[in-house]
Amino acid sequence: MTYENLDVKLVNELLGDGRASLRSLADDLDVSVTTVSNHLQTLEDEGAVNGYTPVVDYERLGYDVTAILQLKVDGTALPEITGTLRGHKQMVSVYEITGDYDVLAIGKFTDTDDMNTLIKELLADADINESSTSVVLNAAAENEQFELDLDGDA
């Protein structure tokens, strides 16, 4: 077997089963365990593969409310505000964005009271000029990952 696209094939195998053993990956990819180990180590060292985490169903664990927060922030305070949001365990995604708002954050909450507590805390910050909150009614797709193309095309 040639090693062309081996890293892409390895990532795709891991997307299918992040707990696969080096032996099973080697068998599936028709290469040696050492080759898989070396390529995987390189992917980890380069930051292309960052850990092996379970996909958690927060709703099953009592986090029934997903909220999307959009914030207008004083420009110089952007790093501070995004850092504050990242510091809250319920915030699963925090983005600096273009458009009408500066920050978009997605959070998981046990109920609307839990959500409101965080929103009130955030709005007490003078650097947040405006906010908009939407509650997700139904997650049509969430935490989706996609297989990489073998030819390098997106």
Swiss-Prot record:
One of its GO terms (biological process) is response to amino acid. One of its GO terms (cellular component) is cytosol. Keywords: Activator, DNA-binding, Repressor, Transcription, Transcription regulation. Residues 3-64 form the HTH asnC-type domain. Residues 22-41 bind DNA. It holds the Pfam family HTH_24. GO terms for molecular function: sequence-specific DNA binding. Transcription factor that regulates multiple target genes, including those encoding enzymes involved in amino acid synthesis, central metabolism, transport processes and other regulators of transcription. Acts both as an activator and as a repressor of transcription. PANTHER family: LEUCINE-RESPONSIVE REGULATORY PROTEIN, TRANSCRIPTIONAL REGULATOR AZLB. This is HTH-type transcriptional regulator Lrp. The lineage of its organism: Archaea, Methanobacteriati, Methanobacteriota, Stenosarchaea group, Halobacteria. The gene is lrp.
